[in-house]
Amino acid sequence: MSAVTQHIIDRGDGARVELFQARPSAPKNGAILFVHGNQGGLLLGGKEAVDDGSLVRFSSRLGVTAAAISQPGFGASDGPADFCGPTTQQAIVAALEFLKQQPSVDPARIVLYGNSRAAVASAMVATKVQGLRALILTGGVYDLREAYGSSSRGLQQAIQKEAGVSNESFLDRSALHHSHRIRAETLLLHGKYDDRASVDQAERFSEALAQVGVPVRFYALEGGHRLPREQVTPILREFLTRIFAPDATLH
């Protein structure tokens, strides 16, 4: 069974980023990095993926290194939170660079997986980092200004506090407007009845990626913001098994 270890890495500006990692006993293979969403005030960060067994489960079943980071302001990562903005994105970039240096990881086979607000940040990271093998996004928004206008008062206040509402702030968090910079194969999962992030956001983002030649698959599932595991699991299994499959060897 994969053992979970905790690491504190440098974000690149002296700030700390907490990362948890489970490594398989298998030979060198790929890696998957999980980025958590809003945790309802618990601020567990990446430890959530440790506590619910996700890291060990993904690592052991796929034979890959599975890691989870704590966003700024969560877990043991230095804050403050900036609602999916440049600081959060830099933390994710630092975690990806850490994984690339691990002896168990093939740096050309790294998958980034962001859920909810982490999908916002992870999509933006994919516009800046070249070489990602794949990108998985669930329940995200990809045009934050548009989403802001129809969001709940509580979410609007969080955006105002953490990010601000300038044009630059919205653009820094809106991958739809930077889709031409993404190269990684992308899997988009979204609930048809999501009341926090409209499924239309994912559909439009999928279309934008396809238009610039990115291999993309979009699934609108029967659910709300929290997607039913019985629908998500088979899609992830098929996608990740293919992504991490050993390269064919010609004799």
Model-derived features with residue positions:
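N-terminal cap/lid segment of alpha/beta-hydrolase-fold proteins
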Residues: 1-27
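Short substrate-entry loop that stabilizes the transition state in hydrolases
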Residues: 28-29, 38-76
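Alpha/beta-hydrolase fold nucleophile elbow
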Residues: 104-116
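Mobile cap/lid helix-loop segments that gate and shape the active-site cleft of serine hydrolases
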Residues: 140-178
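Short beta-strand/loop motif that positions the catalytic acidic residue
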Residues: 182, 188-190, 194
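C-terminal catalytic histidine-bearing segment of alpha/beta-hydrolase fold enzymes
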Residues: 203-251
